[in-house]
Regions:
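Short, conserved "post-DEAD/DEAH" coupling segment immediately C-terminal to helicase motif II
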Residues: 360-368
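Walker A/P-loop
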Residues: 208-230
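Mg2+/Mn2+-dependent nuclease catalytic core
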Residues: 61-157
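A substrate-engagement module of RecA-like helicase motors
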Residues: 179-182, 186, 239-348, 352-356
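Conserved pre-motif I regulatory segment
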Residues: 174-216
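Metal-dependent nuclease catalytic cores that hydrolyze phosphodiester bonds in DNA/RNA
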Residues: 1-83, 105, 109
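Walker A/P-loop NTP-binding motif
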Residues: 204-205, 224-239, 259-263
Length: 369
């Protein structure tokens, strides 16, 4: 039997396992995507003919019952004085003269993973890692370099993988547990209301066939159960990997929560999270996501993974009350934490804006992040 293949990008691997520091909205919005692309192209246009840009790299790591594929694209692979250089380009609005070797550990980590994979592929004893910082406003450029042995890179890489493996095993254990409960789960009422079964069949077929289903029915006809029950069954059959229940009304959101509670009472195991608007769940007088002002933003990334493990091991329904409880216990932003939880939940209940707004915080999940 072929092992399950689990994929993760090099950047996401590094940012999840090694993240440290604080939430700072000033940094998040500092460079727009288009500016970043232009900055990358500007640096890459200066490469020599023997240098290569946007080089795809991947490494498969086999475990007992799954294979982890780590993949990404190195911004540049350069050659200088018979030495190979992995170039990682980072665009910024910060004065590059203020950037030193300790500026961002994650930048080095990402480049080191590329360097390990390439060194292994080409059987290199050592390789140079270069971080190229490019200011999109004043076009200042700074190059930082470190040389690593293959042994150093291999040790770093497998330490990273071991830390991530713990999360994979936690998630695999949950999915097996969840799917066993879905397989034995039947419609939670003795009989269907008029039209309920027909709607449930339509919804299931729409999911499995990748089609759309538009339905209209009066209040009280059991629409929510007719939608969630087949969606959960499709989840257990691996026809989908996440259910989004989107609504503009708090009352409709609560109906979805109550429906999931009924299903859990009948033996279903399912993780669900409610995404509450930042304005409603922020604990501060002013909505300023900067570490100097907000204690829940300050050091957030130092503590969030510990809080995640606590939640995932002991709870299935993540409502605002529970999220606030962990927010106080671990001193983390409740809004950002709810977004973190959505990555691990089977059902995400949220406002329309989180799906359809181009700037929405859940876009990463929808794009397979």
């Amino acid at each position: 039997m072929k092992n399950e293949l689990i994929k993760i990008s090099i950047r996401n691997l590094v940012e999840f396992v090694l993240r440290r520091g604080s939430i700072d909205s000033r940094i998040k919005a500092s460079v727009r995507a288009l500016e970043g692309i232009k900055g990358h192209k500007k640096i890459q246009s200066s490469y020599s003919e023997k240098d290569r840009a946007e080089v795809t790299l991947k490494e498969d790591i086999d475990f007992e019952d799954f294979t982890l594929r780590v993949e990404g694209r190195a911004d540049g692979i350069l050659e200088e004085n018979k030495k190979i250089i992995i170039d990682e380009i980072k665009t910024t609005t910060k004065n590059v003269m203020d950037i030193d070797y300790d500026f961002n550990e994650l930048h080095w980590a990402q480049a080191k993973v590329y360097a390990y994979i390439y060194s292994k592929e080409k059987n290199l004893d050592s390789i140079i890692v270069q971080l190229t910082y490019y200011n999109v406003e004043d076009f200042g450029t700074k190059f930082l370099r470190k040389e690593y042995s293959f042994h150093e890179l291999r040790e770093f890489f497998y330490d990273l993988i071991e830390k991530y493996k713990e999360w994979i095993l936690l998630e695999k254990k949950w999915i097996d547990f969840r799917n066993d409960s879905i397989e034995s789960f039947n419609f939670p009422f003795k009989s269907y209301r008029k039209g309920q079964r027909e709607l449930a069949i339509r919804v299931y077929k729409a999911i499995t066939e990748g089609k759309k289903c538009f339905a209209e029915a009066p209040t009280g006809t059991g629409k929510t159960m007719s939608i969630l029950f087949p969606a959960v069954k499709a989840l257990g059959a691996k026809e989908t990997n996440k259910i989004f229940y989107i609504t503009a009304k708090t009352t409709t959101r609560e109906i979805a929560n109550n429906t999931l509670r009924i299903m859990r009472e009948k033996g279903l195991n399912l993780r669900s999270v409610n995404i509450t608007a930042k304005e409603k769940c922020c604990k501060m007088e002013e909505k300023k996501c900067i570490p100097e002002y907000c204690p829940y933003a300050n050091g957030y990334f130092d503590r969030v993974n510990i809080a995640l493990k606590e939640a995932l091991k002991h709870k299935e329904e993540y409502d605002l009350e529970y999220i606030n409880k962990l927010s106080e216990e671990y001193n983390i932003c409740p809004f950002e934490f709810s977004l973190e939880l959505s990555n691990f939940c089977d059902v995400v209940i949220c406002d329309y804006n989180y799906i359809f707004d181009p700037q929405a915080s859940l876009k990463g999940i929808l794009e397979g992040k």
